[in-house]
A protein has these predicted regions:
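C-terminal active-site rim and adjoining tail of enzyme catalytic domains
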Residues: 41, 123-203
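Alpha-to-beta junction loops
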Residues: 21, 118, 185-188
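Short acidic, Gly/Ser-rich segments with clustered Asp/Glu that frequently serve as metal-coordination loops
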Residues: 1-3
Length: 203
């Protein structure tokens, strides 16, 4: 069962130890995934992807970052999207609610997901944007282009946008950088502290 966690192991963010791939969900669901951050979050658990897709379907557009290189994970994601009726409500190149997108640093996984789940938008994560990566997205109908924030300037935004790609960023460190990102014309950003961002001030 796919779970939602950043690392390949549970060591850093739970009271357990071991690789995710070697554990079943019953074992994973017993772990304390909050106390490392603050004792008041001791009841926090690692959620399954199914739980997230079910709970947040009508609340937000869900962006799934695929970290594993297993084909089975993409196939399972498609099954879950069908189960929760995401596919019938999805349009390409949009952040519809309900809706879901798939992103990854792994080019082969983006291509595989695009093949298995062609109905939804896909995006490529990267550190350094290059012409080759722009071409990769254009040639494979990958609509999202997501470099590390500090590698983005106005020329890149114009170049990518003029070619029909949607550009966003990851790696922002503070609210001031969120303001900078939207002034640059980015379509979205990834942060670890969404509660600090006033969305209305960015519109």
């Amino acid at each position: 069962m796919p779970v939602v966690i950043h690392d390949e192991t549970v060591d850093r963010t739970t009271d357990g130890s071991g690789e995710i791939s070697s554990m079943n969900f019953s074992e994973i669901s017993l772990l304390d995934a909050g106390s490392w951050f603050d004792s008041k979050y001791s009841d926090q658990k690692i959620p399954s992807l199914e739980q997230v897709l079910s709970r947040y379907k009508d609340i937000c557009h869900i962006v799934v970052e695929v970290k594993s290189e297993e084909k089975l994970l993409i196939e399972k994601l498609r099954e879950l999207l069908i189960k929760f009726d995401y596919m019938n409500n999805q349009t390409q190149n949009s952040l519809d609610v309900p809706g879901v997108s798939v992103i990854s640093f792994v080019e082969s996984q983006v291509l595989l997901s695009k093949e298995i789940i062609p109905e939804i938008p896909h995006g490529l994560l990267m550190v350094q944007p290059t012409d080759d990566l722009i071409s990769f997205c254009l040639n494979n109908n990958i609509s999202g282009f997501f470099p590390y924030f500090k590698m983005i300037d106005s020329d890149l935004v114009k170049n990518v946008t003029d070619k029909g790609l949607s550009i966003g960023a990851w790696g922002l460190e503070n609210v001031s950088e969120v303001d900078d990102a939207f002034r640059l014309g980015l379509k979205g950003v990834t942060v670890d502290w969404p509660g600090q961002v006033d969305i209305n001030s960015l519109i």
